[in-house]
Amino acid sequence: MIVRERPDSYIIIRQHDHGQLSGRFAVYWAESPRPFERTIYAITNHDLGWQFLDRSVRWDETSGKPYSFTNYPTDPKLRAYKEGLRLLRNPYATCLCSMHYASFMQGSEDAAEVQFREMEFRRQEKLKGRMSAEELENLEHNFRLLQLCDNLSLFVCLNEPGSNEHPWYKNGFSFEGKKFEPVWEDRGTLRLDPNPFSRPFDLTVPYGAIQRDGRFRESGYLELRVTS
């Protein structure tokens, strides 16, 4: 669950919906990844396993706030990662998403996270051994593209429309030596400077709003135009 806090409520966005938004950024990236379909599939479905956790809002009894993906309890989160990898339909996407999940555990000394990381490293080596030359040659590039598109989608989900207040993105985005700055033209129109996209496109992501006492307030769609 992605949680954006407001003075009187919380905006919640399901992880898999955010993942599909990531895929939209990847589809319109001007330098199309190779192999295209398998990479887009991986980026679009990189949070597939979260759909089971996101069926309901889980509350942190200590803070009195909903758990988000940043502080969700470790054991169910790791189970969601494993389930997401099981559900992916092709080995290339599985490898990319495994690399993505394992990167979250870098430097961790938590026993469960270390075990998960090492297990995924072994999985990745097996999958690499079955890849074509094109798949293997572009694997690291496509992994970095997944990370970038993940962050672009999180930027949209974590910030109020028209703002750049979340601390993760104050300095923009970096990708393979290039820097991209997010620029809001208005509350419903976003561009990156310099422009990395092949053409303008639209984004739509469903959201819910809950009051601080947990009562449902509303649901709707965040709609956004990305210009080029």
Name each region found by the language model:
Residues V3-I13, R24, F36-N159:
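Divalent metal-dependent catalytic cores for phosphoryl transfer on phosphate-bearing substrates
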Residues D17-A30:
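An active-site-proximal "capping" alpha-helix that borders the catalytic cofactor pocket
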Residues E118-S228:
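Non-catalytic terminal regions of proteins
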Residues E31-P35:
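Surface-exposed helix-capping loop/turn segments at secondary-structure junctions
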Residues I2, I11-I13, I40-I43, I210, ...:
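Weak global preference for isoleucine
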